Amino acid sequence: MAEFNLAELNALPKSGQALSLAVVNGQLETLSAEQRVEWALEHLPGEFVLSSSFGIQAAVCLHLVTRIKPDIPVILTDTGYLFPETYQFIDQLADKLKLNLQVFRAEQSPAWQEARYGKLWEQGVEGIEKYNQINKVEPMNRALETLGGQTWFAGLRREQSGSRAHLPVLAVQRGVFKILPIIDWDNRKIYQYLTEHGLSYHPLWEQGYLSVGDTHTTQKWEPGMSEEETRFFGLKRECGLHEG
């Protein structure tokens, strides 16, 4: 497969980037998740980073990537509003998988944000987007800059939502390569991988949560709801990290 020049790709519009990566994406679609990781480590520039929200199925991508590159920095953008079970899950996985965990937070504390802006997540789509910009997007941009990340692994899957249904394996986002090794996995394959490797779902899975983010914008699944409707009051699916 071809080698790519990140600076040249960043000079192109999104459509041009997609066209330039189309052939290699066709080839990547035929590879296993492990082979995609190995290909990226060989053909894409370092530093390499892996992001995780430590959500319902987070153990899969964390285990898969760190088996191949154990010391890869694992970026968590901590809003300060995660479920207690999420913080416990983070500790458990960090210990079990010996993660090189790198935690980044907003420059303003949650209390200061509420004093300054009120509860942004109660202020419609505009408020949610401002909240995400402060607590997710800016810390992630800072993480990439601090760690010198040029290739970013993430655990998104097409099956999770309409906004992810057509994502390619490889793209350019935030000026870096972004590769999604398990993009084409379904829930059955996730379950099989977890079972095979003695890994667990997030603790809230057993309580009916299909997707887990902050306490104030995550709902337990109810009959008739899509997975997308369990986040951000159904107003939007993405927290901002995987947009743009």
Curated annotation (Swiss-Prot):
UniProt-listed NCBIfam families: cysH (TIGR00434), PAPS_reductase (TIGR02057), PRK02090.1 (NF002537)
Catalytically driven reaction(s): [thioredoxin]-disulfide + sulfite + adenosine 3',5'-bisphosphate + 2 H(+) = [thioredoxin]-dithiol + 3'-phosphoadenylyl sulfate
Compartments where located: Cytoplasm
The protein's name in its UniProt record: Phosphoadenosine 5'-phosphosulfate reductase
Name of the top EC class for this enzyme: oxidoreductase
Gene3D superfamilies from the UniProt entry: HUPs (3.40.50.620)
Classification via SUPFAM superfamilies: Adenine nucleotide alpha hydrolases-like (SSF52402)
Record organism: Serratia proteamaculans (strain 568)
Function statement: Catalyzes the formation of sulfite from phosphoadenosine 5'-phosphosulfate (PAPS) using thioredoxin as an electron donor.
Entry EC no(s): 1.8.4.8
Superkingdom: Bacteria
HAMAP family to which the protein is assigned, alphabetical: CysH (MF_00063)
Pathway: Sulfur metabolism; hydrogen sulfide biosynthesis; sulfite from sulfate: step 3/3
One Pfam family it belongs to: PAPS_reduct
Active site (UniProt): C239 (nucleophile)
MF GO annotations: phosphoadenylyl-sulfate reductase (thioredoxin) activity
Record key words, sorted: Cytoplasm, Oxidoreductase
Similarity comment: family membership: Belongs to the PAPS reductase family. CysH subfamily.
Main subcellular location: cytoplasm
Entry GO CC: cytoplasm
Gene Ontology biological-process annotations: hydrogen sulfide biosynthetic process; sulfate assimilation, phosphoadenylyl sulfate reduction by phosphoadenylyl-sulfate reductase (thioredoxin)
Keyword Cytoplasm assigned: yes
Presence of keyword Nucleotidyltransferase: no
